[in-house]
Amino acid sequence: MKILFHENQLSYRGTSNAVYNYALFNQEYLNNESIIIHQKNNKNNFGPAIEKFKKKFEVHSYSNLNEIDKIVSDTKSDLFYAIKAGKIDGVESKNCKTAIHSVFKYYEPHGDVYAYVSEWLSKEMTNGVAPFVPHMIAIEKTDLDLRAELNIPKDAIVFGRHGGDTTFDLPFVKKLIIEISKKRKDIYFVFMGTNSFVFKSIFTPYKNIIFLPKSQDEIYKSKFINTCDAYLHARQQGESFGIAVGEFSIANKPIITWANSEEKSHIDILGDKAVLYTNEIDLNDIIQNFKVDKDKNWDAYSNEFSSERVMDKFKSVFID
């Protein structure tokens, strides 16, 4: 069976990583063939991400929606899979079965199968009537970290975050990080793929606030996670699933997250393992009094979101 996987852009972001993993394990676990299709001129295309896909899959790009069905026919695809916001946008096929995977709070059923990316989103939008296929959480394993490379002491407490460049967006969290960094030199904040919100100078070097570029290197990402003692989440929108949250969670890192976000799939999955804050006072107390507890089980994702369990669900919802 051939599945044509559509993503608007091939990027550093979570949906592209999700598509990569679905396509990879569609081949390795379900023994199907995976082909990739994306928008040629999308401004969010990321060169290293495109190259990563090309190393594993046949990759097609298009400029106009009417090219999709030609690519479906040319590749002899049996299923057209599209991950998208959830709106009717013309991204579907008339030439084969179409599976729509909705990542946001929309309910505009189209295609042959319309499913959400989390149980929380299905409940939120359809009281659980619509099916859901979650993302899988799979990262490369290494025992190495980046502390020596980044000049971070072994005994320092490190709060980390990776994700979309503009989605670390709670102003009071940014303000608090700057304030704490001035007083607590034993606390470090390390961000990967996140726009800097700190003005550094010779007078205010903020050596304990570090911004790293985004990376497609899975081992480097694993080293980054190992560098951190906890994940600091500060996204107003929240998460309809939360891949980065899951990657830290399976590495047994506590997740510190805002309780009042609009989308709460990550909070739903974390349950009592979530470390919640509602305001600056809460977060200041959490950070200032944080103690590393490696004996506690912080992992809320490994059991439900392994590649095998997710692909079994993918097959039952989208393929069968």
Task: Walk through the language-model features, giving the residues of each.
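Conserved donor-binding/catalytic core segment of Leloir-type glycosyltransferases
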Residues: 4-6, 141-144, 152-168, 190
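N-terminal strand-loop element at the rim of the active site
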Residues: 7-13, 20-67, 195-198
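Nucleotide-activated donor-binding/catalytic signature segment of Leloir-type glycosyltransferases, i.e.
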Residues: 54-58, 199-218, 227
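Acidic donor-binding loop of glycosyltransferase active sites
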Residues: 75-77, 223-240, 253
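Donor nucleotide-sugar binding/catalytic pocket of nucleotide-sugar-dependent glycosyltransferases
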Residues: 105, 112-143
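Short alpha-helical segment that forms part of, or immediately flanks, the ligand-binding pocket
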Residues: 222, 245-250, 264-265
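Short hydrophobic beta-strand element within catalytic cores of glycosyltransferases
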Residues: 254-259
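A charged, aromatic-enriched C-terminal amphipathic alpha-helix characteristic of glycosyltransferases
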Residues: 281, 288-320
